[in-house]
Amino acid sequence: MSAPKPTRSQGDLAEMLEMLLDKGVVINADIAVSIGDTELLGIELRAAVASFETAAQYGLEFPTGTDMERVEEAAGISPDESRSLDTRSESEQMDELPGEAGASVSNTAPQEEE
């Protein structure tokens, strides 16, 4: 008997992408390269991947030039609701993220000593 071979179906990839866009993913990374006390390179990465609908529900900022009417239509919210999303603080928006995603998005940049 031969060993079973793993198979991949296109449905799995499509389901994974649908879940990713439906739930959204937030990436928060701080990278520092130092020698001794001298920091040579510092990178702060903040990225969010989500569908327009999910991003609009959480009040994430959209790039300039985005057709906001289409975003509001996709999210099923009125223009008044989208304005109220913009007025909430970032911490209020992050508190609404499901699971630990809201807790993991914070400003963790190292503080300079005086």
UniProtKB/Swiss-Prot annotation:
Residues 104-114 have a biased composition (Polar residues). Residues 63-114 are annotated as: Disordered. Induction: Transcribed from early-log phase, decreases as cells enter stationary phase, probably as a long gvpF-gvpM RNA. Highly expressed in 25% salt, poorly expressed in 15% salt, no gas vesicles are formed at 15% salt. One of its GO terms (molecular function) is structural molecule activity. Disulfide bonds: none annotated. Residues 80-91 have a biased composition (Basic and acidic residues). One of its GO terms (cellular component) is gas vesicle. Pfam families: Gas_vesicle (PF00741). Encoded in a 14-gene locus called mc-vac. Belongs to the gas vesicle GvpA family. A minor component of the gas vesicle, proteins GvpF to GvpM might be involved in nucleating gas vesicle formation. Gas vesicles are hollow, gas filled proteinaceous nanostructures found in some microorganisms. They allow positioning of halobacteria at the optimal depth for growth in the poorly aerated, shallow brine pools of their habitat. GvpF to GvpM interact with each other in vitro, and may form multi-subunit complex(es). Interacts with GvpA. NCBIfam families: halo_gas_GvpJ (NF046090). This is Gas vesicle protein J. It comes from Haloferax mediterranei (strain ATCC 33500 / DSM 1411 / JCM 8866 / NBRC 14739 / NCIMB 2177 / R-4). The lineage of its organism: Archaea, Methanobacteriati, Methanobacteriota, Stenosarchaea group, Halobacteria.
